[in-house]
Amino acid sequence: MTDTTSLAEKLTAHFKDTISGCETDRDQITLVVTPSHLLSTCEALRDEDDFSFSQLVDLCGVDYSTYGQVDWATEETTATGFSRGRETKTITIDTDQRFAVVYHLLSIKHNHRLRLRCYLPEENPTLASVTGVWSSANWYEREAYDMFGILFEGHPD
């Protein structure tokens, strides 16, 4: 059993009631957390000795409204390339999962990395601020608000 598999099993067992998924791809674990359980999950990931994710490496907002679209395909030269600015396309998306906030965590103690993903709806994308858990989230949350309109409740600014 690899360290990644072992960690994924521990995470799934410990957070079975507060997560909506745990995926492993390319030796990277992604824990999908529901918005209502984000803060308690982050505190446990930081404080519990089995995890000790003491460092938030990165936080970013994601807009999935055009995810998977190939507007910038450049496999061949054409006069119709780069159509994003010229054509209007109708895209069907799940409005309950239009946005996501993705957190990249590091456990220096265990030398583990973890990705948390929290999906947010198109209408009023709001999430608890994790600045009380990791102070480094401050500017990242500001940036996600500026770029995507994701509001972080309890943010110091």
Which role does the model predict for each range below?
Residues 1-157:
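Terminal low-complexity/charged segments
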